[in-house]
Amino acid sequence: MKIIRSKDFTAARPWGALDIASMNGITTRLHWTNEPYKWHVNDGQEVFAVLDGRVEMRYREDGREQSTILEAGDIFYAAVGTEHVALPIGPARILVVETAGSV
């Protein structure tokens, strides 16, 4: 049993993570960041839940770039093949559930 206070977690570097669980090839990790990630496409599904802070999520659908602001409590689901990039608006803590070893 473990209790994690997400607001208390700060990584040593942007997108640093606290590994929470690995179940049947799926990982659950708490990330801290204050810098953008990179455009990428996951090889599996991804669940991206903002726990603290705000994140601009940019993604491409039908070749068009779109954007939405995710607030604390919001969840972004990326299906296989969804190209996307997360840009935090200040420090943010994000719970990510995805295939182990995904970008």
Residue ranges of predicted features:
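Short acidic-glycine-tyrosine-enriched beta hairpin
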Residues: 62-80
